[in-house]
């Protein structure tokens, strides 16, 4: 790692994040996270891990999958690849194989963003490199998705991962990633740094399902660099309880006619604190962005739904939409849409609405034989089941199945 990068990380070791609750990292740092045995196929991971994988859309049988990466705590335990048009491997392997890869590290996400990015870099320098490297070859169009899972199996572990995803020119890549904890884990911290690089004409769809334990803290840090005529589509689903999560991925549309879509489905339960959002910087002529979120708060949960669209050059378009349902007097949704225009001839809009379930809808469903609880549950599931755009038909159907499974507890 470059000396300048390490110096920046050292200075930011205690730097608080701009948003979200501050976390004492010393609570989670264990001298040695348990080592986990590598296996050649996903179906050979421990049964307790397999059961959780299915809940987050990761198939242990690897049916219709182009490849698989599974990390348990800090150990990459399974890597497979069934396609010649893509590469997938642990970051430690990739850095040994490709000397040029270091030039991509900490370019889309600044190492001194906060204590979480800094700690990830410092652990990397000490040899604790987690995360995966994915690359699609120029001109390739992989039909089947890659799947990746970050799994926490030990108590009080701080899991760090640094992922780099590169879509070469005119390539298309689909990724399903699931993050989860074991049934015996009550307290842990996950920090995932992800850097995406989309070259000219490339497309990435990235579908993520989170299924954490109630006392787990989560701090993803994501940056996306989008080149000329490239498209990045993110689908995010979280409907299970978690202690707190704070995520604010930022996409930089530097290329002409580049396009970004963020679609998020959030279900706050128990005393979860969800501080979620996305930011798109439109810097290339003809670039565009769409950010859509659906949020439901129950029990004593708190949801902060943020969105920031910045138009920096003429001829860009963007729309930001946040809709929320508050289902209990002890819960809260705080919508924060921001539009920033610093050029002429741009077109940006936002729509935000927070409310409750309409009584007439409940009355109609109860008149058809449902109880009030059944009626409310049906309305919530319908509200959260928004159409996922931009996916191939087979992957869209699978994503809908993953969403339906996630919504069973709502």
UniProtKB/Swiss-Prot annotation:
GO terms for biological process: iron-sulfur cluster assembly. Transmembrane segments: none annotated. It holds the Pfam family SUFBD_core. Belongs to the iron-sulfur cluster assembly SufBD family. This is Iron-sulfur cluster assembly SufBD family protein MTH1150 homolog.
């Amino acid at each position: 790692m470059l000396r300048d990068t390490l110096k920046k990380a050292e200075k930011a070791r205690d730097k608080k994040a701009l948003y979200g609750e501050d976390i004492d990292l010393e609570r989670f740092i264990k001298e040695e996270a348990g080592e986990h045995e590598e296996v050649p196929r996903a179906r050979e991971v421990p049964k307790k891990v397999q059961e959780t994988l299915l809940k987050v859309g990761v198939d242990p049988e690897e049916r219709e999958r182009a490849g698989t990466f599974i990390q348990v705590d800090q150990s990459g335990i399974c890597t497979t690849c069934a396609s010649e048009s893509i590469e997938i491997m642990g970051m430690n392997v990739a850095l040994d194989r490709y000397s040029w890869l270091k030039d991509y590290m900490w370019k889309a996400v600044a190492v001194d963003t906060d204590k979480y990015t800094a700690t990830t870099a410092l652990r990397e320098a000490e040899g604790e490199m987690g995360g995966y490297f994915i690359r699609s070859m120029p001109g390739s169009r992989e039909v089947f998705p890659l799947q990746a899972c970050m799994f926490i199996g030990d108590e009080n572990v701080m899991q760090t991962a640094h992922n780099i995803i590169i879509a070469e020119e005119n390539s298309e890549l689909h990724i399903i990633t699931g993050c989860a904890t074991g049934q015996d884990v009550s307290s842990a911290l996950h920090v995932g740094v992800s850097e995406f690089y989309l070259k000219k004409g490339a497309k990435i769809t990235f579908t993520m399902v989170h299924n954490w334990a109630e006392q787990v803290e989560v701090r993803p840090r994501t940056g996306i660099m989008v080149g000329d005529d490239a498209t990045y589509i993110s689908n995010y689903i979280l409907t299970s309880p978690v202690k707190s999560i704070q995520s604010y991925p930022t996409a930089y549309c530097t290329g002409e006619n580049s396009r970004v879509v963020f679609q998020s489905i959030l279900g706050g339960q128990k005393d979860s604190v969800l501080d979620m959002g996305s930011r798109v910087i439109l810097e290339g002529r003809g670039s565009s962005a769409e950010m859509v979120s659906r949020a439901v708060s129950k029990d004593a949960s708190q949801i902060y739904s943020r969105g920031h669209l910045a138009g920096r050059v003429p001829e860009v378009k963007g729309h930001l939409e946040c809709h929320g349902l508050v289902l209990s007097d002890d819960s809260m949704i705080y919508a924060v849409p921001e539009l920033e225009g610093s050029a002429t001839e741009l077109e940006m809009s936002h729509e935000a609405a927070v409310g409750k379930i309409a009584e007439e809808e409940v009355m109609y469903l109860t008149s058809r034989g449902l109880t009030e609880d059944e009626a409310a549950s049906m309305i919530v599931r319908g509200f959260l089941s928004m159409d996922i755009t931009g996916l191939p038909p087979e992957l869209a159907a699978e994503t809908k199945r993953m969403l339906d499974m996630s919504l069973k507890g709502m």
